[in-house]
UniProtKB/Swiss-Prot annotation:
Its EC number is 3.6.5.n1. It comes from Treponema denticola (strain ATCC 35405 / DSM 14222 / CIP 103919 / JCM 8153 / KCTC 15104). GTP binds at D17, H18, G19, K20, S21, T22, N134, K135, I136, D137. This is Elongation factor 4. The lineage of its organism: Bacteria, Pseudomonadati, Spirochaetota, Spirochaetia, Spirochaetales. It comes from the Bacteria. InterPro entries: EF-4, EFG_II, EFG_III/V, EFG_V-like, EFTu-like_2, LepA_C_sf, LepA_CTD, LepA_IV. Pfam families: EFG_C, EFG_III, GTP_EFTU, GTP_EFTU_D2, LepA_C. Transmembrane segments: none annotated. One of its GO terms (biological process) is positive regulation of translation. Required for accurate and efficient protein synthesis under certain stress conditions. May act as a fidelity factor of the translation reaction, by catalyzing a one-codon backward translocation of tRNAs on improperly translocated ribosomes. Back-translocation proceeds from a post-translocation (POST) complex to a pre-translocation (PRE) complex, thus giving elongation factor G a second chance to translocate the tRNAs correctly. Binds to ribosomes in a GTP-dependent manner. Residues 5-187 form the tr-type G domain. GO terms for molecular function: GTP binding; GTPase activity; ribosome binding; translation elongation factor activity.
């Protein structure tokens, strides 16, 4: 029987690209839980997208054995977490299942914005924090500066920081010993009533839902009937086990352990991430506190390219939702694109990942409309409505006022790029609320700005103007009054509802012009002239024209009378006019994608 005193549960958190997954690889490699032949980079990242982009999207739990220098055998359960701000909810879920957190600081970059936000997240859950300085093998590494920042910026004890190289494995032994001494063993007893937190789940096509749990009190074993305290569902446990990269069957899970349960759960909606599991026969008194439910901030409509694939797309979303608890979707329809779904995402990266997963894992060909945020509208009647879809936007005359969501953005930038970063924030309607010099080379700034402005190209432009050195983290704070307008896009005089966008009125002209220019490049030429117009209400504010393809009707006239030529040209003109009246323009999928990527180049 495993003694809880010999268990350590911790997660690995850091800013993007500071080396979380590489450190996980070294921890796994050092304990030799898998054969050297099967070693590869990013062992904890399962998805092809994660490997290709070199990012972590899903948190991944791993259990490794370790024999300490004092001869005792320990079991370490750790969770490798994502670094991107879009997936910070994954980090909060991992943190809720641990007693400690390894906070990695890159020796070449120092403390960045998500280093701070992840530390605050860990402190909120009373986690013990172990600072680790990574990438000490690089020529540009400055360990003393990193230690100073850990002391000064994070307020942690820099003497306790372990300097390692996750790439070469240097100093990994010292890190293992620090994990044992720094992190406390889990509390709880196997004799108490069962209390376990669901911190994740995934779908297995053969066995149903695999629930990831951290047992706080009591024990779970096959044959027991368990109850989900939030939803009230009861299930008989078929199998319990732990994660050693793959699922490894165990006889039971007891207080302090992290593992999985298979209980014949067939539908995704029955598993609430953050719910508490207890014994149906002897339930515990109260559920665990769980964690904040994640709210989507970016909305987009998704349509199948072929309208006959609607049912297949719905099934794909149901399966995707199981592995991605933060994705929300409901039915939607468009005159131009038929039936589809209105989806909520955590950010643009999340939207891109969902799009790629639909195409790769489920073989779906889909069209995404331009992303939008959730606006709060007050009607002249006094009624308040929430609108995230331009198609549902009421007539402007009926709206008394509109509010849009604002974010509190934390930016850390080298002083050389301070002017560039400030002018970008001002261009995006940001208002500076705080500015602190962390040291002579780095500045931390806080801005309040509309979420809609950050959606499109803010992150890309921030990275390019600061040569990749500035970092950015944000949280949604509140809604504030705004001057809102709906831009309709008309093609050949007909509005295309899927291309409509909601925008800040003073910048509506630029936005409409950009969309029209993009569409002009994407829509193939026809036999007749095609006007592309951007309009607010009945007022046209931008226009581009795709010129017609013309057959040379004068080719057969050699010399001859001008009236004969004129007659042929007039006849062609009449035919074109008639064609324009009945001609429909087919929009290629690339036209919708081009609108998604509308940027000031």
């Amino acid at each position: 029987m495993l003694n809880p005193e010999n268990i350590r549960n911790f997660c690995i958190v850091a800013h993007i690209d500071h080396g979380k997954s590489t450190l996980s690889d070294r921890l796994i490699e050092k304990t030799k839980i898998i054969d050297e032949r099967y070693h590869r980079n990013q062992m904890t990242d399962d998805m092809d997208i994660e490997r290709e982009r070199g990012i972590t999207i899903k948190s991944h739990a791993v259990r490794i054995p370790y024999t300490a220098k004092d001869g005792k055998n320990y079991v370490l359960n750790f969770v490798d977490t994502p670094g991107h701000v879009d997936f910070s909810y994954e980090v909060s879920r991992a943190i809720a299942s641990c007693e400690g957190a390894i906070l990695i600081v890159d020796a070449t970059q120092g403390v960045e914005s998500q280093t701070l936000s992840n530390m605050y997240l860990a402190l909120e859950h009373d986690l013990e924090i172990l600072p680790v300085i990574n990438k000490i093998d690089l020529p540009a590494a400055d360990i003393d500066a990193a230690k100073h920042q850990i002391d000064h910026d994070l307020g942690l004890d820099s003497d306790a920081a372990v300097a390692v190289s996750a790439k070469t494995g240097e100093n990994i032994d010292a890190l293992f010993e620090a994990i044992i001494t720094t992190f406390p063993p889990p509390k709880g007893s196997r004799d108490n009533p069962l209390q376990a937190l669901i911190f994740d789940c995934h779908y297995d096509p053969y066995r149903g839902v695999v629930v990831h749990v951290r047992v706080f009190e009591g024990m779970i074993k096959p044959g027991m009937t368990i109850r989900f305290m939030n939803t009230g569902g009861e299930y008989k446990v078929e199998e319990t086990g732990t994660f050693v990269l793959d699922l490894v069957k165990q006889d039971s899970l007891q207080a302090g352990e992290v593992g999985y349960i298979i209980a014949g759960i067939k539908t995704v909606s029955d598993v609430g991430v953050g719910d508490t599991i207890t014994d149906a026969a002897a339930p515990c008194k109260a559920p665990l506190s769980g964690f904040k439910e994640v709210k989507p901030v970016v909305f987009s409509s998704v349509y199948p390219t072929d309208t006959n694939d609607y049912e297949e797309l719905r099934e794909s979303f149901e399966k995707l939702k199981l592995n991605d608890a933060s994705l929300t979707w409901e039915k939607d329809s468009s005159l131009a694109l038929g039936h589809g779904f209105r989806c909520g995402f955590l950010g643009l990266l999340h939207l891109e990942i969902v799009q790629e997963r639909l195409e790769r894992e489920f073989d779906q060909s889909v069209i995404f409309t331009a992303p939008s945020v959730r606006y709060k509208l007050t009607m002249r009647t006094g009624e308040e409505i929430i609108c995230d879809n331009p198609a549902d936007y009421p007539d402007e005359g009926l709206i008394a006022s509109a509010e849009e969501p604002y974010i509190k953005a934390t930016l850390i930038t080298p002083t050389n790029y301070l002017g560039n970063v400030m002018s970008l924030c001002m261009e995006k309607r940001g208002v500076q609320t705080n500015m602190t010099y962390l040291d002579e080379k780095r500045v931390e700034m806080t801005y309040e700005m509309p979420l809609a402005e950050v959606l499109f190209d803010f992150y890309d432009r921030l990275k390019s103007i600061s040569r990749g050195y500035a970092s950015f983290d944000y949280e949604v704070i509140e809604t504030r009054p705004t001057d809102l307008a709906k831009i309709d896009i008309l093609i050949n005089g007909k509005p295309v509802d899927a291309l409509a966008q909601l925008a800040y009125k003073p910048s509506a002209y630029d936005k409409a012009r950009l969309v029209c220019e993009k569409l002009k490049d994407e829509i193939p030429r026809q036999q007749f002239k095609i006007p592309i117009q951007g309009a607010i209400g009945s007022q046209i504010i931008a226009r581009e024209t795709i010129s017609a393809l013309r057959k040379d009707v004068l080719a057969k006239c050699y010399g001859g009378d001008i009236t004969r030529k004129r007659k042929l040209l007039e006849k062609q003109k009449e035919g074109k006019k008639r064609m324009k009246m009945i001609g429909d323009v087919e929009l290629p999928q690339s036209a919708f994608l081009a609108v998604l990527k509308t940027k000031e180049d």
